[in-house]
């Protein structure tokens, strides 16, 4: 795509929301991932339910789902989307890294990549917020789109 082909700009080169009126509705799915690194003790306390603010993973899961649904309110040019599925899962390395994965699905005229990315980002920020009293050095890293399907551009899979 050439610079002149960018669709978020009008004839005056000012920002606009892309017109998706004539696009066909298709099933669209996106998976995103982010990793938060923390002290070993922090991860152990999360799993043991010993964080003063409550069940960290349950709250982060709900925050991620809510974020997917609110993406168009946070990112100016994102279309409001009827989200038909939003799921958040967690996997850790048993030491210091917790990986957050989101899956977002819709049937619509535009994709859900931004919703999936927003979901993992907000879930990671929620974990940071709930654990910062004991571990201010946590790092949120490697937030990326893993896969997207549907729509005119077809399937995308990140390189492993």
UniProtKB/Swiss-Prot annotation:
Substrate binds at residues 77-79, 114-115. InterPro entries: MoaC, MoaC_bact/euk, MoaC_sf, MoCo_biosynth_MoaA/MoaC, Mopterin_CF_biosynth-C_dom. Pathway: Cofactor biosynthesis; molybdopterin biosynthesis. It holds the Pfam family MoaC. Its EC number is 4.6.1.17. The active site is at 129. It catalyses: (8S)-3',8-cyclo-7,8-dihydroguanosine 5'-triphosphate = cyclic pyranopterin phosphate + diphosphate. GO terms for molecular function: cyclic pyranopterin monophosphate synthase activity. It comes from the Bacteria. Keywords: Lyase, Molybdenum cofactor biosynthesis. One of its GO terms (biological process) is Mo-molybdopterin cofactor biosynthetic process. CDD domains: MoaC_PE. Homohexamer; trimer of dimers. Belongs to the MoaC family. Catalyzes the conversion of (8S)-3',8-cyclo-7,8-dihydroguanosine 5'-triphosphate to cyclic pyranopterin monophosphate (cPMP). This is Cyclic pyranopterin monophosphate synthase.
């Amino acid at each position: 795509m050439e610079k002149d082909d960018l669709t978020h700009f009008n004839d005056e080169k000012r920002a606009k929301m892309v017109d998706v009126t004539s696009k066909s509705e298709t099933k669209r799915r996106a998976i995103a991932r982010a990793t938060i690194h923390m002290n070993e003790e922090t991860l152990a306390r999360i799993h043991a339910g010993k964080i003063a603010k409550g069940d960290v993973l349950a709250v982060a899961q709900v925050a991620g789902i809510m974020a997917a649904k609110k993406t168009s309110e946070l990112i100016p040019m994102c279309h409001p989307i009827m989200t038909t599925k939003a799921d958040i899962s967690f996997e850790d390395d048993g030491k210091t890294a917790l990986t957050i994965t989101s899956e977002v699905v819709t049937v619509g005229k535009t994709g859900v990549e931004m919703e999936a990315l927003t979901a993992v980002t907000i879930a990671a920020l929620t974990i940071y917020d709930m654990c910062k009293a004991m571990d201010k050095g946590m790092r949120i890293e490697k937030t990326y789109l893993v896969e997207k399907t549907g729509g005119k551009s077809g399937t995308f899979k990140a390189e492993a």
